[in-house]
């Protein structure tokens, strides 16, 4: 057996005998920062190799909610806004925070109406997603909204939005060429493209 074959055998052996138990040990924790949306905690830990270290975790107090609207002609709607943390403009599907303890579908309906003025008669959950699992516990749910009716948008006072209606195929191209980088939007568009290609819509 050569070195390459040995490494492959070792990987298979490990996969057969791996455990999903938590290898991290927390020895202490300290609250670093808190506001109405996030909390930052610093943990003193023993890492999986047995060495001491620190780990910072950002806890999100709201669930991330995303909605991909799709009309009967397979047009979708994107929302453009300047994202403060990135210091750049971003095209995304309608998104927002859903308070814990509230049905996420109700939050999705609210976000869609606020940002686009749309209401949908048909709702399908298409994806659940961790958005940045190395530093945060942010959890997202993505919905596909169909059978759309147009009303007036109701944006929040912190939002300066541009709404763009476009063919879904164009939104898919924007993902493929890097014009859309928001992780929930990328996941939603790729999932819907898969559903379309498999005739599941």
Which positions does each model-derived feature cover?
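Short, solvent-exposed loop/turn elements at beta->coil junctions and helix N-caps
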Residues: 29-32, 127-132
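Short aromatic/basic micro-patch
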Residues: 92, 142, 165
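A short coil-to-beta-strand element that immediately follows conserved catalytic motifs
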Residues: 119-126
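Acidic, metal-coordinating catalytic segment for phosphate/diphosphate chemistry
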Residues: 29-66, 72
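Conserved Nudix-box catalytic region and its N-terminal flanking loop in Nudix hydrolases
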Residues: 21-23, 58, 66-110, 157
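Active-site-adjacent beta-strand/loop module that shapes the phosphate/pyrophosphate-binding cleft
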Residues: 41-49, 132-151
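Nudix hydrolase/Nudix homology domain
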Residues: 13-24, 89, 100, 125, ...
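Positively charged N-terminal leader segments that act as targeting/secretion signals
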Residues: 1-12
